[in-house]
A protein has these predicted regions:
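Nucleotidyl polymerases of mobile genetic elements and RNA viruses
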Residues: 1-238
Length: 238
């Protein structure tokens, strides 16, 4: 039953999700997002500055609001029949909390998708796509200009990378994502959100730790766009 529902959801994902989302999609993966390395290298060749924000949401899958999710699925064009089947999977969920002082009474669970369920990744991708559309990033001028398009974000499920050619542009992108994600119950994990810049920093006012390198997927990205560290790392791993 779950595989049938997943196949149905995959059809909507293929239609609704943009190319920048590579998470849990057939024929896509982290290798697509590792293109960040080459973007940096090419940008540095043309003396361009580039700024990255590697976003981490606090307990992203656990914070999906069920009521908002059903409304979002409807707005994304998913049929009432399919949404009803999905709602039934989550209906009547209850839990208790056991502490040193005893066990609480049962209470209803209204948030979170099952992380071990094959449907969860599909549901989260559609949930995230909804609020990412609200950010207007697909229409924003901020980003990395290539010969054919403007790229300002790359995603693998809840792992989101924002990119721009100036610190002000990056700050603008980050604030838009922060505001819209909070509207659907997702919050940025500031301690785990990293900022990386290959250009000068004048008046940095963005939440997140400044780093000179970052592991994205299985590859190491550095501010200088040098692959030597990545090669050495893989040699050590054998």
């Amino acid at each position: 039953m779950l595989k049938i529902l997943q196949a149905r959801l995959q059809q909507y994902m293929n239609r609704e999700l943009p190319d920048v989302q590579a998470g849990f999609r057939k024929g896509r993966g982290t290798r697509d997002q590792i293109a960040n390395i080459w973007i940096i290298r090419k940008a540095r060749e043309f003396w361009k500055n580039i700024y990255f924000s590697f976003i981490d949401y606090a307990k992203a899958f656990d914070c999906v609001d069920h009521n908002k999710l059903w409304k979002i699925l409807k707005e994304m064009g998913i049929t009432d029949h399919l949404t009803c089947l999905l709602r039934n999977l989550y209906a009547g969920q209850e839990a208790t909390v056991r502490t040193g002082h005893g066990t609480t009474e049962r209470f209803q669970i209204g948030e979170g998708v099952h992380q071990v369920c094959t449907l969860s990744s599909c549901l989260f991708n559609l949930y995230e796509e909804y609020f990412m559309r609200s950010t207007g990033l697909h229409e924003a001028q901020a980003g990395i200009q290539t010969s054919r398009r403007n790229i300002n974000n790359l995603r693998y499920a809840d792992d989101t990378t924002l990119m721009a050619e100036s610190e002000e542009e990056l700050k603008s992108l980050l604030m838009k994502v922060k505001e819209e994600s909070e509207k659907v119950g997702l919050k940025l994990s500031i301690p785990k959100t990293k900022i990386m810049a290959s250009g000068p920093i004048t008046s940095w006012q963005i939440d997140g730790e400044m780093v000179t390198d970052f592991i994205l997927g299985s590859s190491q990205i550095t501010t200088v766009g040098d692959c030597s560290c990545e090669i050495k790392r893989h040699l050590l791993l054998g």
